[in-house]
């Protein structure tokens, strides 16, 4: 399950954050991070209903020395999640 996964330190927009690698999540969702550039509002569904998030595009993320560029959502989440949109870029399998 999600809570048995070890948190990893990832670099997002030049900042270090602890996050879980979740192959079951489509999106990468973080809280308490300031990212550069413009954002647009988005609603995402999760456990307990929908939440409003800010969507930042073309954000550089570094996971275990591998780099990916993609969309990062910022909003209230119980834990920072690195989803499939980033994991597939670094060659992480989805099983």
Residue ranges: model-predicted function:
Residues 11-94:
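Aspartic protease
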């Amino acid at each position: 399950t999600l809570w048995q996964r070890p948190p990893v330190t990832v670099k997002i927009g030049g900042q270090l954050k602890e996050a879980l690698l979740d192959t079951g999540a489509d999106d990468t969702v973080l809280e308490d991070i300031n990212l550069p550039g413009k954002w647009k509002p988005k609603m995402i569904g999760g456990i307990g209903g929908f939440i409003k998030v800010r969507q930042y595009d073309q954000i550089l993320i570094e996971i275990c020395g591998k780099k990916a560029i993609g969309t990062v959502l910022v909003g209230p989440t119980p834990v920072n999640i690195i989803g499939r949109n980033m994991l597939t870029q670094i060659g992480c399998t989805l099983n």
